[in-house]
Every structure is written in C-alpha cells, then in structure tokens.
A protein has these predicted regions:
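Catalytic cores of carbohydrate-active enzymes across secretory and cytosolic contexts
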Residues: 1-185
Length: 185
C-alpha cells in the first residue's frame, strides 16, 4: 500500500520504471521509518507462522538471510551452508566475536532420485540442530530449514526477508523469477 501510494498508483506493476518516483523519498525519514515498521511487522508475522508450523522461535532482530529454490548442486545451497559453518567456527573460536545477528532460512525440495540434494538437506538440518542448540550462537546465528516450501509459505517469507541469496553457478539458471519476487518485497 505504501509503495502504491508513493509511486502514484498501479502503474509500476506493468511499467517498473515508474518505481523511479520512489527516489524522491530516499532521505525522507517519515517514509523510511514507515518502511521499517512494515518490514518489522512482516518479520513478526513470518516468525509467528514459523513458530506455529514448525515450532521454531526466530530472532526477529536478526537479518533474515534467505535461500529458497529447488535444491540442486548448481544452485549452491552447499556453498551457503559452508559459509554458515565458517561463521559457526568463528564463533566457536571467539564466543565474544561481534557480529550482526543473522537467521539463515533455507527452503527447497529435491527431486525424488537426487541423492546428493537429499544429503544437502540432511546437512542443513544437522547444522540447524547443532547451531541452534549451541548457547554461544544464541542471538547471533540461527539456521532453519523451512519444511514443505510452497507458495503460501513464500507469501509470508518474501516480505520478511532482508537478504536473498542468488548464488547459482553463472549460466545455469534458466529464467528464475524468485529473485524478482524478493526484490519487490
């Protein structure tokens, strides 16, 4: 609703260049504060949804760092997992390490016969169990694999996310539109 009002109506839906009108509000503290309030409300909504559906309590003060897409080696969910393990090791080496709190959210489905993809899902779930139970990581690092990723879950997730990992191997992603959905939210 706010973007609709600031952009002057629905024109931006068919003509994205109409979003340039938003540049006029780049330093408008009232608009920026309102956008922050909307993002916060979306994060709280998503956190309530995850608690209800998966029993997981999210740190809504953390950055929501998201990678949701079909699981495949070229989409590099494993690379993202290795980055999380690096951060985890940094915290193990220095529990007082200052870092921006981050919740890593994964959502994916694997083809039935794709054994490597299924192992990556197991790895992410194992990492989540270890990291989320570690008191050193509390309020700093959290990992959640979103079960049964689908459109209704995406409707809660996309408006709440702050970072969308788009790290597929160059030239391999045919025509994904998930990045555009995240951008518009």
């Amino acid at each position: 609703e706010l973007v609709h009002a600031l952009a002057g109506g629905d024109e931006y839906l068919l003509h994205p260049e109409a979003l340039k009108k938003l540049e006029a509000y780049a330093h408008d503290t009232a608009v920026l504060d309102r956008l922050g309030e909307i993002k916060r409300a979306n994060k709280l909504d998503f956190a309530a949804y995850v608690k209800k559906t998966q029993g997981v309590v999210l740190n809504t003060d953390a950055i929501f760092d998201v990678q949701v897409k079909r699981l495949h080696e070229y989409k590099r969910q494993l690379l993202n997992a290795m980055h999380i393990l690096y951060l985890y090791q940094q915290l193990q080496n220095d529990p007082n390490r200052a870092m921006q709190p981050r919740v890593f959210l994964f959502g994916a489905k694997a083809a039935p016969g794709y054994a490597v993809a299924k192992r990556i899902i197991r790895l992410i779930n194992s990492m989540a169990a270890e990291i989320n139970a570690d008191p050193i990581c509390r309020d700093k690092l959290q990992v959640v694999f979103l079960e049964n990723y689908r459109v209704s879950l995406a409707e809660h997730l996309m408006p709440a996310s702050e970072v969308s990992q788009q790290i597929s191997t160059a030239g391999k992603e045919a025509s994904g539109t998930g990045n555009m959905k995240f951008m518009m939210n």
